[in-house]
């Protein structure tokens, strides 16, 4: 039996159009070999057509998939579609194959996608997980971690950044805002503390007490988190406790 290919589709279709309308009686004039050949050719052509459909679907899906340097998190559905179509071709019993260049493109794009995803996860675990869960609860403990996260984020490619959720970036931004606000508030109080008498054991003058009261008033307005940014909180406490031993 001659091996069929898709180029024989026209001939097989013509044979089917002639064969199918025959009655049972008319078919008796054909030999068993002719019947068998007709059936085998029809089945084989159907298999070839189905294979062609699988190949076209896979190649179409891969063509729509961005290149490895362009692919981002938003292309997950395209990658999933291409993967499913590619697997159907690859796992076909007839050993179907697609255009080698498209197969290579698929492999490189897929590899890049998961590499970017992993880089994003590494950034997340190393930097984002080091941030406070509550953006309003930023203490001096996070003074290095927050800018470090921003620097690391900027260093990521746009591809990798696409795998970082918008909510995560917003949280980082909120932490930065709180850090800036808290440091600014602490600096203002530190400047007032700098005006306090250097020797806490010396007798305080009216001017000293006025400075202590001003510093204490500003200090009292700070949140517990903001107070962690003060450079000389203890000196203020010592001065205040001496000036007001009764509290």
PLM features: what roles do these ranges have?
Residues 1-247:
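Beta-rich interaction/scaffold domains
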